[in-house]
A protein has these predicted regions:
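A generic short-segment signal for beta-strand/edge and adjacent turn/coil regions
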Residues: 1-3, 16, 33
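Core helices of alpha-solenoid repeat scaffolds
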Residues: 3, 29-30, 60
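Structural detector for internal amphipathic alpha-helices that build alpha-solenoid repeat scaffolds
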Residues: 8-27, 35, 43-58, 65-68, ...
Length: 90
């Protein structure tokens, strides 16, 4: 199942399961997740952000690229990158 299809089914009861499914897609999900992070709100945005953090290092370069293109997105990208890089140390 694709990222968009999973996110369409998202609710409070299945968010953990769907997040796990998104993360299992790995780096192939990152471009769509970054686009969704910039356009979504609420529960979807939270699941997208956590998915990017859990995917980890494969998210970093595309987060940086998106931040360079969209100045309003910079703080979000910086936060997620810090979370990803901080989890490598732990």
């Amino acid at each position: 199942m694709q990222v968009n299809e999973l996110l369409e089914k998202l609710d409070n009861n299945n968010k953990n399961q769907l997040e796990n499914e998104i993360v299992s897609l790995g780096s192939s999900a990152v471009p769509v997740l970054i686009e969704k992070l910039q356009t979504s709100k609420g529960l979807v945005r939270g699941v997208v952000a956590m998915s990017l953090i859990r995917i980890g290092e494969d998210s970093v370069s595309l987060l940086k690229e998106a931040a360079n293109k969209n100045q309003e997105f910079t703080w979000v990208a910086d936060y997620l990158i810090n979370e990803i890089e901080g989890s490598k140390v732990a």
